[in-house]
Amino acid sequence: MRFQCEIVTAPVSVRPVSRLSHDELRRRTLRRQFPSISGTGPEAVLELFQRLGPIQSQVPRAPFLTISSRLPGVRYQTVCELFESYQLVKTSNIRGTVHTSALEQFGWLDAVARTTRANQLRK
């Protein structure tokens, strides 16, 4: 199966790029890693993964620690239920290492990673 991408261009307005200070870059990086999400239920956990993207999970407790550090008060059982219902999945689709991602992300992650791995193996 081959995947084809079609690039669609649309007119865009270009804003002048401003140079960030090191402090502002640090603040923005931390803000991205610790998004402001309200709630501790399944929807909040899935939103967290939508914003963060896949997280490395070679260590079994890594997704639990990542979630609890960003959504204080989330229950262990909530995360387990998301894994049991396959809304969160652990796979090795990125660089051959184990990552946890939301099920919605898995399809495109796997397609991109599979194509990349196939190209690497052909070399």
Predicted regions and their residues:
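Phosphate-backbone binding and catalysis cores of DNA-processing enzymes
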Residues: 3-123
